[in-house]
Regions:
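Alpha-helical transmembrane segments of multi-pass membrane proteins
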Residues: 1-217
Length: 217
């Protein structure tokens, strides 16, 4: 992963907050699925297969398949890591998919599958890109290892608490995103997705600017 361009932790923390919003929307407004957190989605799929009330095999399956499609696309995007523009392009692709999701939520307010699919593709794409970047403790969609590291590497556990600030902020970022997403989705599905699109586009522009400044040094 050393050939990948540098990514600002601040940008990835913003993307982590976006994840919280997206999963709040998908779980609360699209039939109890996760389109970003595939660990949770697989668990929900298992519950649905066992006949748990309020869950759907088809919705969870669509989320999983869409995520895989996005991850394949993200893998293709990351094939050429000789420059740094591919990261911004990928983030702009994600922003476009989230904007599409917001539009679909307006056009098909009672049909969640299109929004599940578009947000799933967006999150799969993002995961493939962030995986290639390989920034420690900032996967942007999963916090299990981050929380484990925070505890297992703490002074209480005999460690020296490396990157505890980054780990803590990542947890807070996703928590804040989930809270904000919940507050917004009470009123409309499209608004939080539109906000996510704008934030992600801003992250793409910020990444372009940061790496442009680095090239000029």
């Amino acid at each position: 992963m050393s050939n990948a361009p540098a990514a600002s932790p601040a940008i990835l923390l913003a993307m982590t907050a976006v994840t919280g919003v997206v999963d709040a929307v998908s779980f609360l407004a699209m039939g109890h699925v996760f389109t970003a957190n595939m660990t949770g989605n697989i668990v929900l799929l298992g519950f649905a297969l066992a006949g748990a009330a309020g869950l759907s095999v088809s919705r969870s399956s669509v989320a999983l398949i869409a995520f895989l499609v996005g991850a394949v696309g993200g893998g293709r995007v990351t094939l050429d890591v000789s420059g740094d523009r591919w990261v911004s392009r990928a983030f702009l692709m994600e922003a476009s998919l989230l904007a599409l999701s917001a539009a679909l939520a307006i056009i098909y307010p009672r049909q969640p599958y299109a929004v599940i699919a578009s947000t799933g593709v967006a999150m799969g794409l993002r995961n493939a890109v962030v995986r290639k970047l390989g920034v420690a403790d900032l996967t942007t969609t999963v916090l299990t290892l981050t929380i484990t590291g925070l505890a297992a590497d703490s002074r209480l556990a005999g460690g020296d608490s490396p990157r505890w600030q980054r780990r803590s902020v990542a947890i807070v970022a996703m928590l804040a995103g989930a809270t904000a997403g919940t507050l917004m989705v009470i009123h409309t599905i499209s608004l939080p997705l539109a906000v996510c699109s704008v934030i992600t586009a801003g992250c793409a522009i910020a990444h372009m600017q940061i790496n442009s400044d680095r090239r000029q040094l």
